[in-house]
Amino acid sequence: MGVKKEKGRKRFRKRKTFGNQILPLELLIEKNKREIINSAELMEEIYMKIDEKHTQCVTK
């Protein structure tokens, strides 16, 4: 008869962690459309960011 091999300690596979990923602006806007539309302050912030990006692209 064969001898049973001793099983070692099971090791858990680490889940892949993706740090704090920054979602692209467009995706954020898609996810939070209702909140943004209802909030004038958020709308202003987004327009400011879009303007900043646009001016950066134009100057490059």
Swiss-Prot record:
Keywords: DNA-binding, Transcription, Transcription regulation
Molecular function via GO: DNA binding
Keyword match S-adenosyl-L-methionine: no
UniProt-listed InterPro entries: SenN/SenS
UniProt-recorded name of the protein: Transcriptional regulatory protein SenN
DNA-binding region: 11-31
Primary gene name: senN
Homology family: To B.subtilis SenS.
Function: Regulates the expression of extracellular-protein genes of Bacillus natto.
Pfam assignment, any one: Fur_reg_FbpB
